[in-house]
């Protein structure tokens, strides 16, 4: 489930990839040009797969809680940095797991052709994230029509897991759609606090 939770290129990395993909993947669902990457005040996102994400503005960044069936199953810790928004770590029922160093999720500014990548230690393994802005594309979702940046996100682990996803990102709002298996999960509703 989520941005990075689709097809795997290597079944050998399936176990390590599943947890890491779910953790990192949903973190990539929200995003903006720095002061406009995400809504400054936060907000509530409802997606067509039933996932609800609550983005809360906190000092120096955001907390992003993921709920399904009314229960929080994960919380991402995001912070502002010199280059954009970084994923510091993920809180799960079993504890908090940091990315060392934090991974750049979204740079201050998106432009077609832009590329960024990073490596980190996460849950006792090395992980790598690479993102390319493929262009701007019109996308229709239950929440409306948007001109969104199409991002290709590649995620790999040292245990052989690999995943590639597409997501559709609108600066100032966040991710309005993302690939899940063969289909597209769309934003149904966004509400500001």
Regions found by a protein language model. Name each.
Residues 23-32:
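Bacterial N-terminal signal peptides
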Residues 1:
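Extracellular attachment/recognition segments
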Residues 34-85, 90-91, 97-98, 108-193:
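Acidic, serine/threonine-rich low-complexity disordered tracts
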Residues 13-24:
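Bacterial N-terminal signal peptides that target proteins for export
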């Amino acid at each position: 489930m989520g941005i990075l939770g689709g097809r795997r290129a290597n079944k050998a990395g399936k176990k390590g990839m599943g947890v890491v993909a779910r953790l990192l993947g949903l973190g990539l669902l929200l995003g903006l040009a720095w002061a406009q990457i995400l809504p400054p005040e936060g907000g509530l996102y409802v997606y067509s797969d039933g996932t609800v994400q609550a983005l809360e503005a906190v000092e120096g960044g955001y907390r992003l809680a993921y709920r399904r069936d009314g229960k929080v199953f994960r919380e991402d810790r995001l912070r502002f940095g010199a280059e954009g928004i970084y994923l510091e770590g993920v809180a799960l029922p079993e504890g908090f797991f940091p990315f060392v160093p934090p991974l750049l999720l979204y740079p201050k500014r998106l432009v077609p052709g832009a590329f960024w990548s990073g490596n980190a230690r996460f849950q006792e393994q090395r992980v790598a994230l690479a993102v390319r802005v493929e262009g701007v594309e019109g996308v229709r979702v239950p929440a409306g029509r948007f001109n969104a940046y199409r991002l290709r996100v590649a995620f790999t682990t040292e245990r052989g897991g690999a995943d590639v996803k597409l997501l559709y990102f609108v600066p100032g709002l966040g991710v309005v759609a993302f690939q899940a298996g063969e289909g597209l999960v769309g934003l149904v509703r966004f509400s500001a606090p």
